[in-house]
């Protein structure tokens, strides 16, 4: 959304919850992407598990400001994203959108994003995992955590210079694909910033594709 620099960028965030199990000897060796859960074996013999299609989207002021960009995407993916209205709306309502440079910015006051995992999502993922693989019945949940995923209306990142702000380059909105395309994206952005021709075509990731 439009911030203190006056640059428009339609981006929201969803919260994903994950758990880690104790080691399981007879568990699957390959990564599993099931109908309602995913799991992947870890180097310590345990598994990282999440519930498929259970990302949580907090309804915040930007949800309304950016509705025209995101409505079609949400309608197409409403079975995979849960909406939640709670205190996060009022917390973000109090964040100033313009702030003087001689005061602490909202980014300085909120340095760490460490959201609480969804207890319901963790319990459902665990129950479905045990149902599919009985070998997990004697395992334990050793840790659970959550994180925010930045998303754009078309689930593709923006990797481009911001035309109205010379020297500002944007690489954001990877929509959950950051680990997969991050290395190539980093190389392409480094080339772009240095004035070189990127090794990949960045036109599909241009800043202005949302009408910005």
Feature names for model-found ranges:
Residues 101-107:
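Short, basic/glycine-rich phosphate-binding loops at helix/coil junctions
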Residues 10, 140, 156:
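C-terminal active-site/capping subdomain that shapes the small-molecule cofactor and substrate pocket
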Residues 53, 103, 161-163:
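Short, small-residue-rich loop/turn micro-motifs
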Residues 13, 51, 143-145, 172-173:
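Active-site proximal loops enriched in glycine and acidic residues that flank catalytic Cys/His/Asp
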Residues 31, 150-151:
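A short catalytic or substrate-binding loop motif that flags glycine-/basic-rich loops and adjacent residues
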